[in-house]
Amino acid sequence: EAEKYGEVNVLASSEDKTFSYIPDCSDLDISEDADYVYICENNTIYGTKFKELPNTKGKTLVADVSSCFLSEPVDVSKYGVIYGGVQKNVGPAGVVIAIIREDLITDDVLEGTPTMLKYKTHADAKSLYNTPPAYGIYICGKVFKWLKKQGGLEAIKERNEKKAKILYDYLDESKLFKGTVVPKDRSLMNVPFVTGDKDLDAKFVKEAKKAGFENLKGHRSVGGMRASIYNAMPIEGVEKLVE
């Protein structure tokens, strides 16, 4: 999609192994005239997560954090732009949160960019340039308060790590199920797994639904199963799945 608006260089990829790992991004071949380096920090389809941010060699880092936002503490000073839809961990679909370094909020944008697609438009209008999705924002506020009551992002991270460990430990020991991501790059939010038999995968999803487990079918592009264990999923839910 980005190629519609400018030149794009793919600096690193794990396509060679079905995106089952995060490639080494410590010494990327970044062109001098690059405007920014972009990553999707957590891949919901393949279940991978950047545990270490790329070395952008001074270039601005832009990150889509839709599926890992507020799942753990983040040093925002390492980014130029952090953005994402709230529908995974914060609130209902239809709201987007963007955290932008102030020097990047300018009128210096691609020629032809519509007014309402400029960050500066919304920053200047305090996010009220057009009618905001008030109810969605209200729900986000309730979630923020809930997060604080849980002990903040440090406590949420600890709980998310505990949930993920329960599931990954089971998969690593199982003779039937197998995780699809190398251990060091595993997501805390999305856990894909397979049996190695498509018919058996389908049977598992069907039987799991009867047992009260919804949406365990993997993304249509990869198949298998996927357990999404976002902030709202209690530890008990993961324990029940393992049982």
Describe the residue ranges of each PLM region:
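General beta-strand structural signal in soluble alpha/beta enzymes
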Residues: 10-13, 39, 61-65, 83-85, ...
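Conserved PLP-binding catalytic core of the aspartate aminotransferase-like
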Residues: 177-208
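Conserved active-site segment immediately N-terminal to the catalytic lysine
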Residues: 62, 76-87, 96
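A short linear hydrophobic-aromatic micro-motif
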Residues: 176-180, 212-218
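Active-site C-terminal subdomain of aminotransferase-like
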Residues: 86-168, 182
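Active-site phosphate-binding strand-loop segment of PLP-dependent enzymes
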Residues: 2, 14-69
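PLP-dependent enzyme catalytic core of the Aspartate aminotransferase-like
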Residues: 210, 219-243
